[in-house]
């Protein structure tokens, strides 16, 4: 596939004179392009929904959700994975982000890493990939060899797979069970796929991880009831979540949370059902952690 023929690499006729514009006009132009991203994603929501269901099923069976990409795409996967433990209370290692070239590539490009088709496979082998894991390959261009090799290996093992790219009918899409291809058009700055393409990938990842965690019972109403209260901000958030879910006072919420070691779900259950902390935990275990079912 010729890079120059890709939509993501083509010149944008709306921004041909970007360097001649005033600062405000330049930013307005970029913003006009950014506004196209959500509309492009709306068109591929059925594919995103498929990927969410696959991810949730994999995680329910004890598998992992593994993101893999190079450059901006890889960094976005690492970012989303790193946010899952504090947001949803899942263990580190349940959602994993891999970037071509390893952790050092987060800060500085590792030359040639993305072009190594065997490297993606080796990185997954190092994780001892099994068929219960789901692998999501990310590449704005849709042609990154590192991602192709990884998806091919995952598919051979029988893993559920998804590919996220911003060009239609891309090579990585052909390697995956589910293809998510929001076509956001040429970038405001030609070929700079950290812009619209990066934004599109981030929005899809937001939905993928959040949707899967909702299905795992990590959310009640629209509240992150498995949040880990590991700092002052998150302790405050835990209190506010309990208040929102139960209607009690701040003082009552804090009292309940102290009895549950600041675990939100049992605190809510205690207050709404009038049970002890131990009984609340037992009810949650019986319902596999699903707060709504326990209520």
Swiss-Prot record:
PROSITE patterns: GCKR (PS01272), SIS (PS51464). The keyword Lyase applies. It catalyses: N-acetyl-D-muramate 6-phosphate + H2O = N-acetyl-D-glucosamine 6-phosphate + (R)-lactate. It comes from the Bacteria. InterPro entries: Etherase_MurQ (IPR005488), Glucokinase_regulatory_CS (IPR005486), MURQ/GCKR (IPR040190), SIS_dom (IPR001347), SIS_dom_sf (IPR046348), UBA-like_sf (IPR009060). Pathway: Amino-sugar metabolism; 1,6-anhydro-N-acetylmuramate degradation; Amino-sugar metabolism; N-acetylmuramate degradation; Cell wall biogenesis; peptidoglycan recycling. Induction: Induced by MurNAc 6-phosphate that releases the repressor MurR from the DNA. Repressed by MurR in the absence of MurNAc 6-phosphate. Its EC number is 4.2.1.126. The keyword Nucleotide-binding does not apply. CDD domains: SIS_Etherase. One of its GO terms (biological process) is amino sugar catabolic process. One of its GO terms (molecular function) is carbohydrate derivative binding. It holds the Pfam family GKRP_SIS_N. Residues 55-218 form the SIS domain. Keywords: Carbohydrate metabolism, Lyase. The active site is at 83 (proton donor), 114. A lyase-type mechanism (elimination/hydration) is suggested for the cleavage of the lactyl ether bond of MurNAc 6-phosphate, with the formation of an alpha,beta-unsaturated aldehyde intermediate with (E)-stereochemistry, followed by the syn addition of water to give product. Homodimer. Belongs to the GCKR-like family. MurNAc-6-P etherase subfamily. Specifically catalyzes the cleavage of the D-lactyl ether substituent of MurNAc 6-phosphate, producing GlcNAc 6-phosphate and D-lactate. Together with AnmK, is also required for the utilization of anhydro-N-acetylmuramic acid (anhMurNAc) either imported from the medium or derived from its own cell wall murein, and thus plays a role in cell wall recycling. This is N-acetylmuramic acid 6-phosphate etherase. The gene is murQ.
